[in-house]
């Protein structure tokens, strides 16, 4: 079984989403023997944004990296993403990664009856952090976008582990992290994924 772990925060060791994504991964690695984890830090090792040269495949190194990104995603049974909310949405580095895996003919296809996802059978867990509180707010373009893009690729099991209001005060931050850690996938859920 393979797990793909991505982090998109620019805050390094001060990142709440990184702390939460690491806890999610630890929950899975602690319970699934032989779990192979592939990790990519999208801040330290970003996926290039799509450009005309990307489509023309004139940059061999970029084309090779794009194929590796795609293959890691296709091979993963579980995808864990540390995704902070930036300006009501996601970091551009995460969007660049999504642009490399949401590819017609690879992870979805168009039909006369509408798009069909080709990447089903995966479980996605998003470790989300937000300075304010945006759940059920019209300003939340992060979670709806991530749910939609993964559903478009055929992945309907998308779970969020969320810490909100972390910029309000140190106590809010601590409480939000504790609440998010308490909401990690249960041992039963992990066992069901491993089965």
UniProtKB/Swiss-Prot annotation:
Record flagged with keyword Flavoprotein: yes
Claim: Cell inner membrane is one of the keywords in the record: no
Organism: Stenotrophomonas maltophilia (strain K279a)
Catalyzed reactions: 2 a quinone + NADH + H(+) = 2 a 1,4-benzosemiquinone + NAD(+); N,N-dimethyl-1,4-phenylenediamine + anthranilate + 2 NAD(+) = 2-(4-dimethylaminophenyl)diazenylbenzoate + 2 NADH + 2 H(+)
Name the record gives this protein: FMN-dependent NADH:quinone oxidoreductase
Similarity field: Belongs to the azoreductase type 1 family.
Matching PANTHER family: FMN-DEPENDENT NADH-AZOREDUCTASE 1, FMN-DEPENDENT NADH:QUINONE OXIDOREDUCTASE
Cofactor: FMN
Coiled coil: none
Subunit structure: Homodimer.
Binding site for FMN: 9, 15-17, 85-88, 129-132
């Amino acid at each position: 079984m393979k797990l793909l772990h991505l982090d998109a925060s620019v805050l390094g060791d001060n990142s709440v989403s990184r702390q939460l994504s690491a806890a999610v991964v630890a929950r899975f690695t602690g319970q699934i023997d032989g779990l192979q984890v592939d990790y990519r830090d999208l801040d330290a090792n970003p996926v290039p944004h799509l450009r005309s040269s990307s489509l023309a495949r004139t940059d061999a190194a970029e084309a090779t990296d794009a194929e590796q990104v795609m293959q890691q995603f296709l091979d993963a049974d579980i995808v864990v993403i540390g995704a902070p909310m930036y300006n009501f949405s996601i970091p551009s580095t995460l969007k660049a990664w999504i642009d490399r895996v949401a590819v017609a003919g690879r992870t979805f296809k168009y039909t006369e009856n509408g798009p069909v996802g080709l990447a089903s059978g995966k479980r996605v867990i998003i470790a989300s952090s937000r300075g304010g509180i945006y759940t059920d707010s019209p300003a939340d373009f992060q979670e709806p976008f991530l749910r939609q893009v993964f559903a478009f690729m055929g992945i309907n099991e998308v779970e969020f582990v969320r810490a909100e209001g972390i910029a309000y005060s140190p106590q809010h931050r601590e409480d939000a992290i504790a609440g998010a850690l308490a909401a990690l996938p249960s041992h039963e859920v992990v066992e069901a994924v491993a089965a």
